[in-house]
Amino acid sequence: MKSFIRMTLTAATAALFVACSGGESRPDSGGGSIVLGFSQIGAESEWRTANTASIQSAAPEAGITLRFSDAQQKQENQIKALRSFIAQRVNVIAFSPVVETGWETVLREAKSANIPVILTDRAVEVSDKSLYLSLIGSDFVEEGRKAGRWLLANTKDIAGDINIVELQGTVGSAPANDRKKGFAEIIAAEPRFKIIRSQTGDFTRAKGKEVMEAFLKAEGKKINVLFAHNDDMAIGAIQAIEEAGMKPGTDIIIISIDGVKGAFEAMIAGKLNVTVECSPLLGPQLMQAVKDLKAGKTLPKRIITKEGIFPMDVAAKEFPNRKY
């Protein structure tokens, strides 16, 4: 089936297309299947697996042909995938960038080829914001703030300093940078909250466990709170805490982000205190954005997903509603 982007446009239609798009490239509004090239970070967490499943199931439902690439958490693999999509002349490129920087050159190549780019889940740092059309996903700074607000509200009765250890996400990634920023912004209001250790766990359970073991060896019972940038690291850390003879969720307050089923199971077991939602189910929103481009519509620069926060006491009630 021919890609609609290769169909011949009349001069009048082409002129109208440019006028509607404000000078930015768009797929044309002709018939035929839309081909979307998508580069995924990898499969580092339960969240990412659900995100991939959402995109892969939403594409055929929307009548979109998906060309999918797994970067195995390496930026060089994502850049190769984007260049492959450009060479294949896909209609739209979408990707979730493993880190924020280092994309300028390949995004300029996509723009030169008149292939629009949509970001999902994570942002990029580029000098020219026209290199991508839209970012679909969560407000990571606000997620960090939600975690911080919950901590302040739920430790009012605890006297003295509160020592926090932090499991950061992948170094240089948007969620790691922004969740840290939002959390630090909120706890700065009370000097008694002190981050005594902070290290990357790379968003994985195995690394989360390994780093938490090091935190416990260095600080032991001085640790009052663990703030993990995602649920998988928190779940790994829970294992380390238990192996150290302590009770997660009681001896150490544990706050994490994502809202995956594993986190709800940990809360039901009394081992995790709260999870801040970060929905991976971006597939339908992405496919709608791609179809809107085909129809000649201009996308909002930022499309933010609506998300909540789930403390331990609501976990059992909410668990049957979880889709990931």
Question: At which residue positions do the language-model features occur?
Answer:
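Hydrophobic alpha-helical segments within soluble ligand-binding/sensing domains
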Residues: 30, 36, 78, 135-162, ...
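Extracytoplasmic "Venus flytrap"
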Residues: 33-62, 66-84, 88-90, 96-100, ...
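Hydrophobic alpha-helical
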Residues: 95-112, 183, 197, 201-265
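Short, low-complexity disordered leader/linker segments with a strong preference
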Residues: 1-35, 60, 108-115, 317
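Short beta-strand elements at the ligand-binding edges of bilobed clamshell
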Residues: 68-70, 126-153, 166, 198, ...
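Hinge/cleft segment of the Venus flytrap/periplasmic-binding protein
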Residues: 32-34, 167-175, 186-187, 278-324
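Short, solvent-exposed amphipathic alpha-helices that sit
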Residues: 47-62, 143-147, 174-193, 207, ...
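Flexible loop/hinge segments that line or gate small-molecule binding clefts
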Residues: 101, 105-142, 163, 260-266, ...
